[in-house]
Amino acid sequence: MPSVHPVVRDDAVIWAALTYEGAARHAIAAYKDGGRTDAAAALAGPLRAAIVAALAAVPGGRQGRGAGRCDAGPGIQLVTIPSSRRAWRVRGYHPVDALLHRAGLHPFPALAQRTEALDQVGLGRAARAANKSNSLVARRSLDGVLVILVDDIVTTGATLLEARRAVAAAGGTVVGLATLAETRRLLSP
């Protein structure tokens, strides 16, 4: 069972199931970049657990019925961060969407890439924030829609914070953030 824990990045509390190190790091890297789609079987459960924790933290107790249930209830949508065009071409699938489907959940396709941001690997905290600034846009109006943002790995939080901005700009409200894993690298400016 994963050790779901809160991660704070700027003013955001993000629920993460794993720490991106050791076996978790190898499994996630193999799944995302090594073509090991079979690793989804091991990774879907931890991501689901992070989403359950995010739902449990929503004011009004929208966590669902019973321990471990992931019943978002009416109006709460699971919104993933869209893959870059390059990543889609290389992989042929969107890793987080595939994990949600494997966990019996359904992503709500609310966001699109406005600009093709650089790969975040190797960028520091400030460079990541600048790289992601205004890179996402909502595909439609999100007026009145409650959202839990879901991503694979949180480092500095730049991607999730940009997604939160894009959802708010379209009229939606982010009520939670969940990730498969968090890494503690690159937390200094």
What are these regions (language model features)?
Residues M1-P189:
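Glycine-rich phosphate/pyrophosphate-handling loop used in enzymes and phosphotransfer proteins
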